[in-house]
């Protein structure tokens, strides 16, 4: 498969134009006409992650956080980013990032699904796409009323986490997940009490 075939599919599912204006997503390095057979997924492209991907035989790396956020003035072996870009090019590895576009169009719904929320609404609206409101976060009802301790355990198990940090009375009852968002000095209550 050519890299552009995979990136085209990703662009249809998680379009770059859904990302925040400040974000840098999509094909960030490499030749999208390269043949790919092994894709390495990571949260961040650190030097250690890159070394592991190379050792693993990856010819494409997809990360959540882009390693390039703003303009680069030099690409050389004297900076972390420069070394990574040089290595990607020298090894012929294609590098693609999906950050806020994935947060808006994938991660929020996935997180709600994993924690068994239903009747969800978007927490912080960023746009309307194909007749559906899109944005960061979800607010919804839990499968049943439970203690905060039980909900923390549900999150921990559903997301396969080692630890979950919780603030508040662990014995208090919750029936839905609710967030308050601070935006331009205005507090938005999502109506979950």
Regions found by a protein language model. Name each.
Residues 1-193:
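Hydrophobic structural segments
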């Amino acid at each position: 498969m050519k890299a552009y075939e995979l990136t085209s599919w990703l662009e249809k599912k998680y379009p770059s134009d859904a990302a925040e204006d400040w974000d840098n997503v999509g094909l960030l390095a490499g030749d999208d006409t390269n043949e790919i057979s092994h894709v390495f997924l990571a949260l961040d492209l650190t030097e250690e992650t890159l070394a592991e991907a190379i050792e693993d035989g990856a010819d494409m790396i997809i990360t959540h956080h882009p390693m390039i956020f703003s303009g680069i003035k030099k690409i050389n072996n004297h900076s972390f980013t420069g070394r990574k870009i040089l290595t990607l090019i020298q090894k012929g590895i294609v590098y693609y990032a999906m950050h806020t576009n994935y947060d808006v169009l994938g991660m929020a719904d996935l997180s709600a699904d994993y924690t068994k929320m239903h009747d969800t609404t978007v927490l912080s609206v960023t746009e309307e796409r194909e007749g559906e409101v899109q944005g960061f976060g979800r607010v919804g009802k839990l499968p049943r009323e439970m203690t905060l301790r039980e909900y923390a355990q549900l999150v921990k198990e559903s997301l396969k986490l080692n630890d979950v940090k919780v603030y508040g009375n662990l014995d208090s009852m919750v029936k839905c997940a609710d967030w308050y968002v601070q935006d331009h000095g205005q507090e938005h209550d999502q109506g979950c009490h």
